[in-house]
């Protein structure tokens, strides 16, 4: 009896780059993403998680990962809020633009769960809302990841 498991597919590695600001909220996205990828694909997908200090570091890290050739896609996730010192829209825009540039220059899909709310106050109500919202966004990102990988596979066939 053959005790070796043989798959008729290759495992696709997905990199997740998460910012550590508001880690408890951002981690909900990552957990939901991992769970949804497992639900959708079983062992077809392997998710590797990488931490960066803040959102601003995501594009460079995503590019470094994409250029290795080991990843079929990269997800960047962060929670960019108004800290009262500088305009958070500037940071969010720079991060999203950087992520777009990474996918266009490397050919590796880079998905975004980098969210910047219009208003965020460090209150129990806002924390609870975004804690739950990042769970939804993680599931959505997983479905988008599977869809874009399937679309690219179809193009390559």
From Swiss-Prot:
Give, as in the UniProt entry, the pathway in which the protein acts: Cofactor biosynthesis; riboflavin biosynthesis; riboflavin from 2-hydroxy-3-oxobutyl phosphate and 5-amino-6-(D-ribitylamino)uracil: step 1/2
Q: Does the keyword Cell inner membrane apply?
A: no
Query: GO molecular function terms here?
Result: 6,7-dimethyl-8-ribityllumazine synthase activity
Domain of life of the organism in this record?
Answer: Bacteria
EC number(s) on file: 2.5.1.78
Catalytic residues of the enzyme: 87
One Pfam family hit: DMRL_synthase
The family database entries (Gene3D superfamilies) matched by this protein are listed as: Lumazine/riboflavin synthase
UniProt-annotated binding residues for (2S)-2-hydroxy-3-oxobutyl phosphate? 126
Q: Which UniProt keywords apply?
A: Riboflavin biosynthesis, Transferase
Oligomeric state and partners? Homodecamer, arranged as a dimer of pentamers.
Q: What name is this protein filed under?
A: 6,7-dimethyl-8-ribityllumazine synthase 2
The gene that this protein is the product of is ribH2
